Amino acid sequence: MSEVVTVKQTNMENIYECEFNDGSFRLCTRNLVSGFNVYGERLIKYEGVEYREWNAFRSKLAGAILKGLKTNPIRKGTKVLYLGAASGTTISHVSDIIELNGKAYGVEFSPRVVRELLLVAQRRPNIFPLLADARFPQSYKSVVENVDVLYVDIAQPDQTDIAIYNARFFLKVNGYMLLVIKARSIDVTKDPKEIYKAEVEKLENSNFETIQIINLDPYDKDHAIVLSRYKG
């Protein structure tokens, strides 16, 4: 296995680039829970600090960063509502980035998957797993505070509508949304580019300002991620 040569801070807070002796590069985050990985990712020790390799084929946020995301609104101390947290791959890296003074509320609909997320959260006190249906944000309104960032990764035909509805409940004015658009979950017959355009129009008609649209290929085929700001 290749060995790490250097670890450098990227232009995004708490996100690093690991260079290996074979000339390859990987994203990584500083491990909040030293000695433990989450999804089989490599742990990297460098100058007395442990980092976790961030696999862009397993995490759409990592893919977006490698595909040129200009700014990451998730930083140290950020409060995040994550819809579609699944078993905890991406939200665990969010946990590393926001550190202990941040909070990551993870909504997941599947009881089986939430059990896996709970295991991750047991070691990460800044992750708050919620077994809930993202279509009904009122069901978790009593436990989720207003957040700085809404991250949405759900496979529903009305995923953008669900995101907008949650934003009205929880996203601060001038807060940011990272919306994963899964073209094949919306319409298998249309060109993905047409779908991305239509979903962005929905956002802009609901007081969101589009900042950037990123096609996630080759990390995720027929997926895009949209960074937008909520004007309230």
Swiss-Prot record:
Keywords: Methyltransferase, RNA-binding, rRNA processing, Transferase, tRNA processing
SUPFAM superfamilies in alphabetical order: S-adenosyl-L-methionine-dependent methyltransferases (SSF53335)
EC number, UniProt record: 2.1.1.-
Subunit: Interacts with nop5. Component of box C/D small ribonucleoprotein (sRNP) particles that contain rpl7ae, FlpA and nop5, plus a guide RNA.
Function: Involved in pre-rRNA and tRNA processing. Utilizes the methyl donor S-adenosyl-L-methionine to catalyze the site-specific 2'-hydroxyl methylation of ribose moieties in rRNA and tRNA. Site specificity is provided by a guide RNA that base pairs with the substrate. Methylation occurs at a characteristic distance from the sequence involved in base pairing with the guide RNA.
Family in the record: Belongs to the methyltransferase superfamily. Fibrillarin family.
Descriptive protein name: Fibrillarin-like rRNA/tRNA 2'-O-methyltransferase
Gene symbol of the encoding locus: flpA
